Amino acid sequence: MGLFSKPEIIILKESNDAQTYLDKLKSLQQLASGDLQNQIQKEIALTQAGIIGEENILFELKHSNMDMIVLHDIYIETHSGLGAQIDFIVITAKIIFLIECKNLVGNIEIDSNGAFIRTIFYGHTKQKEGIYSPITQSQRHYEVLKEARIETSNWLKGISIKYNFSSFYKPLVVLANPKTIVNDRYAKKEIKQQVIRADQLVATIKDMVAHS
């Protein structure tokens, strides 16, 4: 990675456990009937959307033209039993990014309280509904990783991690559906900075690294 060398992008665990889960669902669907078959079909659609979303993010990272290590689909568990399935951990020279991928259908509005409201269009009608905040999910994963890092360090390093974790670990929520329109006009600044579209991911990473 010296002068004039090509940026190196290392992808670890590029395969996705979701694909194995999807294959099992498809096998179960063939054996099911009635309401159960319909429920499995909905789960298949959600799983397929998640896989496509993560593939979109992986594509962006592979073409980032910067040095990084990408850990894909990582499960972390603390001694106390808290667990977190993190879509991507992106390690750069200065910052480690925790990326939560959301391939949501419909348009997303984020209000001043941080609530997420989704609008889905059905022909000439539209339906609004609140959805679970991906910020909350991302923050929970962030705290689990922080606790796990402290647990696996000696007491001195653990203290340093406790008070400096936020300087080196940054959570991001990436909306991977290119058709999704995000209205964050009334969202707080920190939420606007944390929730981005997939096509903004690389630029956001480069900007945060440059200003760290």
Residue ranges and their predicted role:
Residues M1-A84, I95, F121-S212:
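Surface-exposed interaction regions that form or flank ligand-binding interfaces
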Residues D87:
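Cell-envelope/extracellular polymer assembly enzymes that use nucleotide-activated donors
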Residues V90-T119:
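Active-site beta-strand-loop-beta-strand hairpin of nuclease catalytic cores
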